[in-house]
């Protein structure tokens, strides 16, 4: 994931605790901590390889106290109360929707920042069936590609 897209995602974070699902190299939690947007983060990935890369980057930046890593699928490794904001970027829409099907188990999650690679209309349709609404929709360009970032807030 390139820096411009990461910066755009991080700039949308409005809460102190973050869970980054499909963290890959943990760039989102690292930049979120470094920028002061969040105080603590959990980087979650389903695969060992990306999680090891994430851990290396976290340790290299000296952020092991602020960012914890967990191996697992989607929101399953997360406990309610651990994160107010969840980021999911760089996955297809169907995968994101599958992950978010567990969303109702988490009363503490107040914001979603989602950047699907495919089927933006399907995501818009899905989010309208949840307790969240799209607060802001950004489109950024990196190289020849356009990326859409949805900042969604919980209806309270």
Model-derived features: positions:
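Class I S-adenosyl-L-methionine
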Residues: 2-5, 76-77, 82, 94-156
